[in-house]
Curated annotation (Swiss-Prot):
Quaternary structure annotation from Swiss-Prot or TrEMBL: Part of the RNA polymerase complex.
Biological source species: Korarchaeum cryptofilum (strain OPF8)
GO BP, sorted A to Z: DNA-templated transcription
InterPro entries in the record: RBP11-like, RBP11-like_dimer, RNA_pol_Rpb11_13-16kDa_CS, Rpo11-like
Classification via Gene3D superfamilies: RNA polymerase, RBP11-like subunit
Pfam family name, one: RNA_pol_L_2
Descriptive protein name: DNA-directed RNA polymerase subunit Rpo11
Length: 98
């Protein structure tokens, strides 16, 4: 995965992400849009045959878009770690009958 900040201003950031599309960006945008400090988050896949996406984030006045994005990524990683651990725990307790 390659990440390139295409544009950044006081309360907006646009990031080009190569090597990822909906699998990563859909949950990230959902996480971002759940935050009070976010006015809008969305993404676009400019061409269906290329694994490239553009993430757009606009935050409320006084917030830093880079920091809000980093925080959302951290929270998403924590959520997936919890889900992964719970899944592994459940699988470990299953008894397989042959």
């Amino acid at each position: 995965m390659e990440i390139e900040v295409v544009d950044v201003s006081r309360n907006e950031i646009r990031v080009l992400i190569r090597g990822e599309t909906h699998t990563l960006l859909s949950p990230l945008v959902e996480e971002l849009n759940s935050l009070d400090e976010v006015e809008f988050a969305g993404y676009d896949v400019p061409h269906p045959l290329k694994e490239e996406s553009v993430l757009f984030l606009r935050v409320k006045e006084g917030m830093n878009p880079r920091e809000v994005l980093k925080g959302a990524i951290r929270r998403l990683m924590e959520k997936y770690e919890i889900i992964g651990n719970s899944f592994i725990e459940e699988l470990s307790s299953l008894k397989v009958n042959h």
